């Protein structure tokens, strides 16, 4: 009985399932043959085929294909085609125009090239067209017939020609127009005013000229207008008041001039007004200064003037105020604290005077405050008032309070202060005790003042302090031993408050860098700067415990005793300057273990003995050791004549160099013979062989010396003959004023040759041995390494103690300069320019890896080794320092080089440099381009000091979009930026085998 019932149930359920299956199959839409044919032709032009697409001639069920939606009335017409972010490459087919029932066409975030087929602009039912973030080019046709269109997004492509404002003639229902990040040029034409329903108009980062057309001001529903980074000019029209729904107005980085119109009381919903870097004059309009809706006001870098008057009682929503670099004068507005939500204030570089108002005691919301270069007075009053700002974390007061006394008032207390900069004020007094109560202090800069007395021991009690600059004062006594115990420099537990990303943070320039090329800004590396004081006593052995310290500068003091060998424990150290002291003994050999040390000086001390020759010491110039009793192989030979070979200059002068002359005498035969061989090879390559030199491969020292005094070997046949004297004249005898940076193994000078050409001359340090072999490697290899994305070696010269390399001059300096040092650099580097820089540099690297014979490993890929010409084309520099490889080798086992933050993890495990190591370093550069952040930067929140770790963390939290530089990131170009981020992360794989080849890297970047 039970079996019978079970069978009946099974039969019933089977019949029921068959019924539903039959019913469903009868109602399922099958793709209309007309649309099927169009889709097959469309996909035939693209690769790879999307998942689930069936490219078989027998299949007719395209309504089930990925990204396809058909209507529900059994006609099988395609109404949605959505294949965004599918890595599709190829071109679009005219057959798309046959999908005459389509409502949504979304092919964004792919790699589609060429122009848009004309047929697409005649789809009468199309409501959404999104082709953003592709590689599409050409102009937009004058005839557009899209009457149902509501959203039109062609941003982040390569479209050119006139702005397609005529789209509104037949598309009156359109609500969103996004054309940003393209190459549209010419006058900002009228036409958009016919789109009466328009809400978003994004035209930023093109090349538009003229002014905002009048018909645009008829758009009552417009809430976002982005026209930033064009070349628009003239005054901002008063008719902007008609845009009553406006929420965000961005006119920054244009050429607007005149006064800002006083019409903001008619823009009741405006939250964000960005007008920085224009030519606005006058004051803040009264209506803008009374806006209750405004959240952010950025008018930095204009010519605004007069008294600053804001009605903060009315500005109840204001959060960020940036009016830096203008001409405001008078006193600081007393009512700023009435802006109850105002957190970030930048008023630096104006002409304010007087004192910080007493009312600032009530500025409870204030977090970031910069008043640098504002001619303020009464620092005692200012600090006494600002201490009441309970949320204040960053205070920058540089270039104020000239000659006043730094108060030592025990009642002062800054509870949450993390960054304090009161530099270059010529303050008198001593280190105030009240600073010790700021327990969260992380960065303290009191440099370039006139402070005296001892540096107190409590300075080492700060748990988070990682940057201390007390240089250029008059401190006396010993260095407090407590500094050797700074917790932030012995552990990774560091957290720094990061200012608002739209605000310029205080930056300390590298004063030794005098021009664009190779310039670097020290982005707050962990630092102890105590130079140019009157400190005495020893350098404590315990300083070796500061494993996280990057810069240790004690120059120009009266320190005595020996250099502790324990300093080798400062394993992150990049710069060590102990020059101009009274140190004795020898240079510890253990310092050779400092792998990242790139700047070192012990000049003008009383040191003796042998200069270490291993590690980074082979790269330091003789000037690092001068005015001591030191000797060393390849420098000042240690021999029977050691006494005469020592440098015996007066402590503070640089007279004749007897030891150098003897050293040159011992090495001249080798140097001049090497010169003859290199000259002979170079002339043979150029087809200009001197018969006398060819006959005699050995010349006496006098003859070669005479040739060397005149000869500059040039590799370009059209270059005019040069002599060493010409190079001296072109650099004013290598005057420091012509230094444009420090490249590999020496200084780089800007030179203008007799024919008017600009070049960069690298003057190599060192005399022979390893240094000469590196020089010969550069000369022999770079003369054959010719590629548009490499810095061209134009020639070289041997003369006496000088070895000179002559390079092409790069007008725009280094990528590092534009990203990290020049204040407006990141904003001027648009995304398309950054992408082109990455693509070019990758091509240069591919040539080094595969195009050269022998192949070359760069081994020091970084943003400061990517130079930019006048058109911002990228050129790899300093690759001559790489070890050479035969075409059949896959790695070299030599002493490793590199720069902290760019070095692959595997380099710490074995002395093996590989192509994949260069790819890793290139991935770090890609992150710099995307984020505008340094690889290692202490001024980041906890866990964000290391750029790679921070990016990985943000990706895992699905917050990848937050890593992008806000100056270039927008929905218009996010597809390209996400793709480059993906490429960067692949380059940064911990397993070298999982990283792309250089060829793949180039191909992927070209397809972005």
From Swiss-Prot:
What happens upon changing residue 923 to K?
Decreased guanylate cyclase activity and impaired PSK receptor function
Location(s), subcellular = Cell membrane
Q: Kindly list the residue ranges recorded as spanning the membrane.
A: 660-680
Q: How is its activity regulated?
A: cGMP suppresses kinase activity.
Write down the superkingdom of origin. Eukaryota
Recorded hits in CDD domains, A to Z, give:
STKc_IRAK
Which residue positions does the secretion signal occupy? 1-25
Glycans attached where?
A: 55, 64, 73, 106, 160, 170, 187, 242, 301, 311, 373, 378, 391, 472, 493, 510, 534, 606, 622
List, for all copies, the residue spans of the domain called Protein kinase: 734-1005
Query: According to its UniProt record, which cofactors does this protein need?
Result: Mg(2+); Mn(2+)
Q: What's the stated role of this polypeptide?
A: Phytosulfokine receptor with both a serine/threonine-protein kinase activity and a guanylate cyclase activity. Regulates, in response to phytosulfokine binding, a signaling cascade involved in plant cell differentiation, organogenesis, somatic embryogenesis, cellular proliferation and plant growth. Involved in plant immunity, with antagonistic effects on bacterial and fungal resistances. Not involved in PSY perception. CNGC17 and AHAs form a functional cation-translocating unit that is activated by PSKR1/BAK1 and possibly other BAK1/RLK complexes.
- Which family does the record claim for this protein? Belongs to the protein kinase superfamily. Ser/Thr protein kinase family.
Q: What is this protein called?
A: Phytosulfokine receptor 1
Q: Which organism is it from?
A: Arabidopsis thaliana
């Amino acid at each position: 009985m039970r079996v019978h019932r079970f069978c009946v149930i099974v039969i019933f359920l089977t019949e029921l399932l068959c019924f539903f299956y039959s019913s469903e199959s009868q109602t399922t839409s099958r793709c209309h043959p007309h649309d099927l044919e169009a889709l097959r032709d469309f996909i035939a032009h693209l690769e790879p085929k999307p998942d689930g697409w069936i490219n078989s001639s027998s299949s007719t069920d395209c309504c089930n294909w990925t990204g396809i939606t058909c209507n529900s009335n059994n006609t099988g017409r395609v109404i949605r085609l959505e294949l965004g972010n599918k890595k599709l490459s190829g071109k679009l087919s005219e057959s798309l125009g046959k999908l005459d029932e389509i409502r949504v066409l979304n092919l964004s975030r792919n790699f589609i090239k060429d122009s848009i087929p004309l047929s697409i602009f005649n789809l009468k039912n199309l409501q959404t067209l999104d082709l953003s973030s592709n590689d599409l080019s050409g102009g937009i046709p004058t005839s557009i017939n899209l009457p149902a269109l509501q959203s039109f997004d062609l941003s982040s492509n390569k479209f050119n020609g006139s702005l397609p404002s005529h789209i509104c003639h037949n598309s009156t229902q359109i609500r969103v127009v996004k054309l940003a990040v393209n190459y549209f040029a010419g006058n900002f034409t009228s036409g958009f005013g016919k789109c009466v329903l328009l809400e978003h108009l994004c035209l930023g980062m093109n090349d538009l000229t003229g002014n905002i057309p009048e018909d645009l001001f008829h758009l009552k529903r417009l809430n976002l207008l982005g026209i930033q980074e064009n070349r628009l000019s003239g005054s901002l029209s008063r008719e902007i008041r008609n845009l009553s729904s406006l929420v965000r107005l961005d006119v920054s980085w244009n050429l607007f001039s005149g006064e800002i119109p006083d019409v903001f009381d008619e823009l009741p919903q405006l939250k964000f007004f960005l007008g920085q870097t224009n030519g606005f004059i006058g004051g803040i309009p009264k209506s803008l200064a009374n806006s209750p809706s405004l959240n952010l006001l950025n008018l930095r870098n204009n010519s605004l003037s007069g008294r600053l008057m804001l009605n903060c009682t009315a500005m109840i929503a204001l959060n960020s105020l940036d009016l830096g670099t203008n001409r405001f004068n008078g006193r600081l507005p007393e009512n700023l604290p009435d802006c109850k939500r105002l957190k970030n204030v930048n008023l630096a570089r104006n002409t304010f005077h007087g004192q910080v108002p007493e009312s600032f005691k009530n500025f409870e919301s204030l977090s970031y405050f910069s008043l640098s270069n504002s001619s303020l007075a009464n620092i005692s009053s200012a600090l006494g008032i600002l201490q009441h700002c309970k949320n204040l974390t960053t205070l920058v007061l540089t270039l104020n309070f000239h000659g006043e006394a730094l108060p030592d008032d025990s009642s002062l207390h800054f509870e949450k202060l993390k960054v304090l900069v009161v530099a270059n004020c010529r303050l008198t007094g001593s280190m105030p005790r009240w600073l010790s109560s700021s327990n969260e202090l992380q960065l303290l800069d009191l440099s370039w003042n006139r402070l005296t007395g001892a540096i107190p021991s409590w300075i080492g009690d700060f748990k988070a302090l990682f940057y201390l600059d007390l240089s250029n004062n008059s401190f006396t006594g010993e260095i407090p031993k407590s500094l050797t115990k700074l917790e932030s420099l012995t552990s990774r537990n560091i957290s720094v408050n990061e200012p608002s990303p739209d605000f310029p943070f205080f930056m300390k320039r590298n004063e030794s860098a005098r021009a664009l090329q190779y310039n670097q800004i020290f982005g707050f590396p962990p630092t102890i700067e105590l130079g140019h004081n009157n400190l005495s006593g020893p350098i404590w052995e315990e300083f070796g415990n500061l494993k996280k310290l990057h810069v240790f500068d004690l120059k120009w003091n009266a320190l005595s005793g020996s250099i502790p060998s324990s300093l080798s424990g400062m394993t992150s150290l990049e710069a060590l300057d102990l020059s101009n002291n009274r140190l004795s003994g020898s240079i510890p050999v253990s310092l050779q273990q400092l792998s990242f040390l790139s700047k070192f000086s012990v000049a003008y001390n009383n040191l003796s003995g042998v200069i270490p020759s291993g590690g980074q010491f082979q790269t330091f110039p003789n000037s690092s050791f001068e005015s001591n009793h030191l000797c060393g192989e390849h420098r000042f030979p240690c021999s029977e004549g050691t006494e005469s070979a020592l440098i015996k200059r007066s402590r503070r002068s640089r007279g004749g160099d007897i030891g150098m002359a003897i050293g040159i005498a011992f090495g001249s035969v080798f140097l001049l013979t090497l010169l003859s061989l290199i000259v002979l090879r170079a002339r043979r390559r150029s087809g200009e062989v001197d018969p006398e030199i060819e006959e005699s491969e050995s010349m006496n020292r006098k003859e070669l010396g005479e040739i060397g005094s005149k000869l500059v070997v040039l590799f370009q046949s059209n270059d005019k003959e040069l002599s060493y004297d010409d190079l001296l004249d072109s650099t004013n005898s290598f005057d420091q004023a012509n230094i444009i940076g420090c490249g590999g193994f020496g200084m780089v000078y800007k030179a203008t040759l007799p024919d008017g050409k600009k070049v960069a001359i690298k003057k190599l340090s060192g005399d022979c041995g390893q240094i000469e072999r590196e020089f010969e490697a550069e000369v022999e290899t770079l003369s054959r390494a010719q590629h548009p994305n490499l810095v061209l070696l134009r020639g070289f010269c041997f003369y006496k103690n000088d070895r000179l390399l002559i390079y092409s001059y790069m007008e725009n300096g280094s990528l590092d300069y534009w990203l990290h040092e020049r204040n407006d650099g990141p904003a001027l580097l648009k995304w398309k320019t950054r992408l082109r820089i990455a693509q070019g540099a990758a091509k240069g690297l591919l040539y080094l890896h595969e195009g050269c014979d022998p192949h070359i490993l760069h081994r020091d890929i970084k943003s400061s080794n990517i130079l930019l010409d006048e058109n911002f084309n990228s050129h790899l520099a300093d690759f001559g320092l790489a070890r050479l490889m035969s075409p059949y080798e896959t790695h070299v086992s030599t002493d490793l080089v590199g720069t902290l933050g760019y070095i692959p993890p595997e380099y710490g495990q074995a002395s093996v440099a590989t192509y994949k190591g260069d790819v890793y370093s290139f991935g770090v550069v890609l992150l710099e381009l995307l984020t505008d952040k340094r690889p290692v930067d202490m001024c980041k929140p906890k866990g964000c000091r290391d750029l790679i770790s921070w990016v990985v963390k943000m990706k895992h939290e699905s917050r990848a979009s937050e890593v992008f530089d806000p100056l270039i990131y927008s929905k218009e170009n996010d597809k390209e930026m996400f793709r480059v981020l993906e490429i960067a992360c692949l380059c940064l794989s911990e397993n070298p085998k999982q990283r792309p080849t250089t060829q793949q890297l180039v191909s992927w970047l070209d397809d972005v």
